[in-house]
A protein has these predicted regions:
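Beta-strand-turn-beta hairpins that frame and shape the catalytic cleft
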Residues: 1-6, 101-111, 158-162, 186-187
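Acidic, His/Gly-rich catalytic cores of divalent-metal-dependent hydrolytic chemistry
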Residues: 157-234
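Core catalytic region of metal-dependent phosphoesterases/phosphodiesterases
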Residues: 2-94
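Anionic-ligand binding region
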Residues: 127-166, 178-180
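Glycine-rich phosphate-binding loop signature in dinucleotide/nucleotide-binding domains
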Residues: 25-30, 55, 104-106, 138-141, ...
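Active-site environment of divalent metal-dependent phosphoester hydrolases
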Residues: 12-17, 41-44, 66-72, 120, ...
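Active-site-proximal segments of metal-dependent phosphoesterases and phosphodiesterases across multiple
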Residues: 75-79, 106-140
Length: 234
C-alpha cells in the first residue's frame, strides 16, 4: 500500500501560514510531508525550517530556485535570509535533492520536483503549450508529477502524465490563504485560511522592508494575472 502525502510548496518562510497548514496536516492522516522547495526565503527563514524539521522523519525536502539564490547570496534580500539560517541549516538546505519519487496510495509512482523534473526555475503553467510540457516531461517515467514554482494551484493531464501543482503556502494566488494538497488515494487541493494581517504585522517587526511580503498577502493576483505575467516572460 502506498503513502498518503501532504505537498507543501513555496512556503517562502511565511511561518504563520505554515503553522496554520500543519495544524490541518495533523488531522489529514498523512504519512509524509513533502516540502517542495522555496521554503526558507522570506520573513522567518530559520524559524520556518525549524518548524518543518520538527516533523522528523515524516518530512522530506526539495531544493527550489530560491534556496540556490539564497545560499549564493546574490541580492541583499537573499543575503538577509541566508544570514538568518544557522550554518548547519544552510548545509542541510544545500544538500536537498531536486527530485523525489514516492509510491503514493492510489496514484502509484509519483515524482516530486520544484518546477520541472529538469530544472528548479523553468516556468510551465496550465496555459503553456502541450509541446513545451511534453519536452519538459520527456524523461519522466512516473505517470504523476507534483510541481510548484508558479504558485498556481491546478490538476491537469499532459501527454499521459497527471500534473499537480499544490499552489503556494506562503505567497498565494487567487485569494489570501495558504494553498497546499494531499495526495492519496485521490488528489485533494486545499486552501487554509489564517490571519494574514497578523502575519504582515509580525513580519514588519523583523524584516528590513515588509512591503514585498505585504503585497503577497494583500494584492493577491488572480490566476489570470499570474498566468499573463508568466507567459509574457517565456
Amino acid at each position: 500500500m502506498g503513502l498518503r502525502v501532504a505537498a507543501l510548496y513555496d512556503v517562502h518562510a511565511n511561518l504563520p501560514a505554515l503553522e496554520a497548514v500543519l495544524a490541518e496536516v495533523e488531522d489529514a492522516g498523512v504519512d509524509l510531508v513533502v516540502f517542495g522547495g522555496d521554503l526558507v526565503w522570506g520573513p522567518w527563514p530559520g524559524e520556518t525550517l525549524d518548524c518543518a524539521e520538527a516533523l522528523g522523519e515524516r518530512a522530506c525536502f526539495l531544493r527550489g530556485n530560491c534556496e540556490t539564490l539564497l545560499l549564493d547570496g546574490l541580492s541583499e534580500r537573499h543575503r538577509w535570509a541566508r544570514d538568518r539560517l544557522r550554518p548547519e541549516q544552510r548545509t542541510r538546505a544545500a544538500a536537498w535533492p531536486l527530485t523525489l519519487s514516492l509510491d503514493v496510495d492510489g496514484l502509484g509512482s509519483t515524482l516530486f520536483c520544484h518546477a520541472t523534473p529538469r530544472s528548479a526555475d523553468e516556468i510551465l503553467t496550465p496555459a503553456s503549450s502541450e509541446e513545451r510540457w511534453a519536452d519538459a516531461l520527456a524523461a519522466t517515467e512516473e505517470r504523476v508529477l507534483v510541481c510548484g514554482h508558479t504558485h498556481l494551484q491546478f490538476d491537469r493531464e499532459v501527454g499521459g502524465v497527471r500534473v499537480v501543482n499544490p499552489g503556494s503556502v506562503g505567497a498565494p494566488t487567487r485569494r489570501p490563504a495558504a494553498w497546499w494538497a494531499v495526495l492519496g488515494p485521490e488528489v485533494e487541493l486545499r486552501a487554509t485560511d489564517y490571519d494574514t494581517e497578523g502575519a504582515i504585522a509580525a513580519a514588519s517587526a523583523r524584516v528590513p522592508d515588509v512591503r514585498p511580503f505585504a503585497r503577497w498577502l494583500r494584492d493577491t493576483p488572480s490566476d489570470d494575472e499570474r498566468l499573463a505575467d508568466f507567459e509574457a516572460a517565456t
